[in-house]
Structure formats: structure tokens, C-alpha cells
Amino acid sequence: MKYLAAYLLLTVGGKNSPSASDIESVLSTVGIESESERVEALIKELDGKDIDELIAAGNEKLATVPSGGAAAAAAPAAAGGAAPAAEEAAKEEAKEEEESDEDMGFGLFD
């Protein structure tokens, strides 16, 4: 993900076809070591492709993915009673909050 983010930053900045050294340079400015194999694989995959078209195609694919998280949470409540399901949901929310607070939002490129 960090390699793709660096690639996109370079393309938004006006570099139409970023090289491996460009991507590695962007990553090194924020203290991230890069793996040249992964950088080369990314460049190979994106070579000759329009970024805007790739983003549009990705958005279309994401739109078709069902997001049934709410339906799955409602099913145990209907089958097993509201009290245990509510207690379980509260535990899950507390656990998710702990996990999301661990990096304080600074783990963008980790």
C-alpha cells in the first residue's frame, strides 16, 4: 500500500511515469525503507495504464461488494435474545476502539 501511495503522490505531483528511484525517494523522505522487488512489481503492473481509469474500475468493483456487517450482527439477536447479543456487541466495540487507538492514526505507511 505504501508503494502505491508513493506512486499516486508522484503522479498527482505531475510525474506521469514514476520510476523505481522516484518511489524509493518519496518513501525515504518519510523514513521508510523500500523493497526494490515490490517497487519494480508495482511499476510493472501499472506501466502504460491510466491511473484515473484504474481508480474508476476499482470503485466499480468496490460498489459490487456486499457490506453485510449489520445483517450479520442482527441475526444473533433475533435467534438468541437481545441481552447476550447486546453484551457481545459492546465487548466487540470496546475491542475495536482499543485496536484503533494503538497507533493514534500515525501508521499510514506502516
UniProtKB/Swiss-Prot annotation:
GO terms for cellular component: cytosol; cytosolic large ribosomal subunit; RNA polymerase I complex. Residues 95-104 have a biased composition (Acidic residues). The keyword Magnesium does not apply. One of its GO terms (biological process) is cytoplasmic translational elongation. The keyword Ribonucleoprotein applies. Component of the large ribosomal subunit (LSU). Mature yeast ribosomes consist of a small (40S) and a large (60S) subunit. The 40S small subunit contains 1 molecule of ribosomal RNA (18S rRNA) and at least 33 different proteins. The large 60S subunit contains 3 rRNA molecules (25S, 5.8S and 5S rRNA) and at least 46 different proteins. The acidic ribosomal P-proteins form the stalk structure of the 60S subunit. They are organized as a pentameric complex in which uL10/P0 interacts with 2 heterodimers of P1 and P2 proteins. Component of the ribosome, a large ribonucleoprotein complex responsible for the synthesis of proteins in the cell. The small ribosomal subunit (SSU) binds messenger RNAs (mRNAs) and translates the encoded message by selecting cognate aminoacyl-transfer RNA (tRNA) molecules. The large subunit (LSU) contains the ribosomal catalytic site termed the peptidyl transferase center (PTC), which catalyzes the formation of peptide bonds, thereby polymerizing the amino acids delivered by tRNAs into a polypeptide chain. This is Large ribosomal subunit protein P2C.
